[in-house]
Amino acid sequence: MAKLKITLKKSLIGRKKDHIATVNALGLKKIGKVVEHEDNPQIKGMIKKVSYLLEVEEV
């Protein structure tokens, strides 16, 4: 499977609690932090929910 490189680009201040929880579940806490995850339906769904906060690249 492909890997996805996910970067947090915007602040979590003032966001809905479920959006903050989703970003934290992806392993992102600070702006500019980068994580890699396998490309699977669960991760795709999490990315879709908070896509306005993230930058996603295929590795």
Curated annotation (Swiss-Prot):
HAMAP family: Ribosomal_uL30_B (MF_01371_B). One of its GO terms (biological process) is translation. One of its GO terms (cellular component) is cytosolic large ribosomal subunit. Keywords: Ribonucleoprotein, Ribosomal protein. It comes from Clostridium kluyveri (strain ATCC 8527 / DSM 555 / NBRC 12016 / NCIMB 10680 / K1). Belongs to the universal ribosomal protein uL30 family. This is Large ribosomal subunit protein uL30. Part of the 50S ribosomal subunit. GO terms for molecular function: structural constituent of ribosome. CDD domains: Ribosomal_L30 (cd01658). It comes from the Bacteria.
